[in-house]
Amino acid sequence: MKDMSLVNSKVLLVGSARGIGFSVLEHLLQAGAQVMAADCEWQLLLEQSESLLGRYPDQLTLKKLDLAEPEAVREQVNQWAEQVAGFDHLVCCAGILHVAPLHEMPMEQVSSIFTVNAFGVLACMQGVASSMKARQQGSMVIIGSNAANTPRMSIGAYGASKAALHMLVKCIGMELAPYGIRCNLVSPGSTRTAMQQQLWTEQYGEAQVIAGDAAQFRLGIPLNKIAEPADIAQAVLFLLSDNAGHITLHDLRVDGGATLDH
């Protein structure tokens, strides 16, 4: 088996200031990648990345990017790709969540979720695609969700946006496969992040997520634990690496068996 070294690979990482994205950033730098890390939370990105900039001054560049404006995102990402003579890899971890019953959620919130989670991520993929096509190589790994395949109460818009994203990734992956470009998804289940904690209350937290809840029509987690951000990051690095050289259009679910692989 080949190692998962990404030495000198140029990676655009979108959504890198917290949670899964920040763990992916740490793993990419440890693997030797040259990373352009972008996030809409600029101040948080600066604060979180301070120690990484000290340890990897020649590998890390920080940028601000807001996926709420997809047309601007596509143009900006394309410009960055031109500046670095093309990215080898794109990783998108960005996403937003509003928690409310879908039958009551304001359309403004539904629209904002789709704009960021589906259209903004698509804009990133479009932004790197032309330079990858010209070089006849590249890979994209997009963070999806196991909620794309399994209905969940109070996060219906989020799940629907991720379902749309999954199909966008697979379709663009099919279009780009003849050019040697691989496009894959990593779909986390419950993971120890701030977004996950938005769903927890005093009565419903980590233990209940693991055990499952019939009233919420939720199975538990067969592995009896929630994921850590590093679990997701390691899956991302595998799909970026040469070990996954014949894998594309794939959804790698990292949820401890919570959706029984359906």
Curated annotation (Swiss-Prot):
What InterPro entries would the database entry show? Answer: DHB_DH, NAD(P)-bd_dom_sf, Sc_DH/Rdtase_CS, SDR_fam, SDR_superfamily_enzyme
> Looking at the record's lineage, which domain of life comes first?
Bacteria
EC numbers: 1.3.1.28
Q: Which residues make up the binding site for substrate? A: S145
Class of this enzyme: oxidoreductase
Which molecular-function annotations from GO does this UniProt entry contain? 2,3-dihydro-2,3-dihydroxybenzoate dehydrogenase activity; oxidoreductase activity, acting on the CH-OH group of donors, NAD or NADP as acceptor
In this chain, NAD(+) is annotated as bound at: 12-36
**Which keywords does UniProt give here?**
NAD, Oxidoreductase
Q: Which residues form the signal peptide?
A: none
Q: In which pathway does it act?
A: Siderophore biosynthesis; vibriobactin biosynthesis
Q: What does the sequence similarity comment in the record state about its family?
A: Belongs to the short-chain dehydrogenases/reductases (SDR) family.
According to its UniProt entry, the function of this protein is described as: Involved in an early step of the biosynthesis of the catechol siderophore vibriobactin. Vibriobactin is a chelating compound involved in transporting iron from the bacterial environment into the cell cytoplasm.
Which PANTHER family is this protein grouped with? DIHYDROANTICAPSIN 7-DEHYDROGENASE (PTHR43477:SF1)
Q: What is this protein called?
A: Vibriobactin-specific 2,3-dihydro-2,3-dihydroxybenzoate dehydrogenase
Organism of this sequence: Vibrio cholerae serotype O1 (strain ATCC 39315 / El Tor Inaba N16961)
Upper taxonomic classification of the species? Answer: Bacteria, Pseudomonadati, Pseudomonadota, Gammaproteobacteria, Vibrionales
Gene (name only)? vibA
